[in-house]
């Protein structure tokens, strides 16, 4: 069962990669809502986007990703794996979300954003690194504590009679 749950986590990570790839398909400015306010402001100043487009893309991203990811993990854990009760649901949700979080931190943030030009926005190179050490600390903290909280909330919701 553990291997299956890890594979489901890899599947969720693949969905994350797909969302990111679609988001930057016409250039990284398409996902500038994930960047710092300084980068966003520079993009607006350079005429690459507007504050309205940034807000719109952020809302679309949240409206698609959050429900999509929640649906994915719930279908995997309760629909496919048949988890019963809080504990079974919690550990499976936590593993799936943690695997995705590791992929996000190491592969997306660490490699794709940090070591390739795919996420470079022309005219903002002087603002690199786009993900600062402080940002990384916050993401790791949320990724560990936050995913546990999300797993607990979802598991509790699924066990309420």
Give the predicted meaning of each segment.
Residues 40-54, 120-137:
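Short membrane-interface loop/juxtamembrane segments of multi-pass integral membrane proteins
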Residues 24-32, 78-82, 109, 113-117, ...:
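Transmembrane helix-loop junctions in multipass membrane proteins, especially transporters and channels
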Residues 6-30, 96-112:
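Hydrophobic alpha-helical membrane-embedded segments
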Residues 1-12, 57-90:
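Long, highly hydrophobic alpha-helical transmembrane signal-anchor segments
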Residues 152-161:
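Juxtamembrane boundary at the C-terminal end of a transmembrane helix
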Residues 50-64, 131-148:
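Loop-to-transmembrane boundary segments
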Residues 15-57:
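Interfacial loop at the N-terminal end of multi-pass membrane proteins
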Residues 86-92, 103-124:
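Membrane-proximal helix-loop-helix units in multi-pass membrane proteins
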């Amino acid at each position: 069962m553990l291997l299956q749950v890890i594979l489901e986590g890899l599947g969720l990570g693949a969905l994350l990669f797909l969302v990111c790839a679609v988001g930057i398909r016409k250039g990284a400015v398409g996902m500038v809502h994930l960047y710092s306010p300084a980068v966003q402001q520079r993009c607006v100043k350079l005429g690459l986007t507007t504050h309205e487009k940034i807000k719109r893309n952020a809302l679309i991203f949240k409206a698609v990703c959050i429900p999509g990811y929640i649906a994915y993990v719930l279908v995997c854990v309760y629909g496919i794996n048949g988890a019963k009760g809080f504990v079974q649901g919690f550990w499976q949700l936590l593993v799936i979300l943690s695997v995705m979080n590791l992929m996000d931190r190491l592969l997306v943030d660490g490699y794709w954003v940090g070591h390739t030009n795919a996420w470079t926005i022309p005219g903002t190179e002087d603002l690199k690194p786009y993900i600062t050490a402080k940002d990384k600390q916050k993401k790791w903290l949320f990724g560990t504590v936050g995913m546990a909280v999300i797993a607990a909330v979802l598991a509790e919701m699924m066990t309420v009679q």
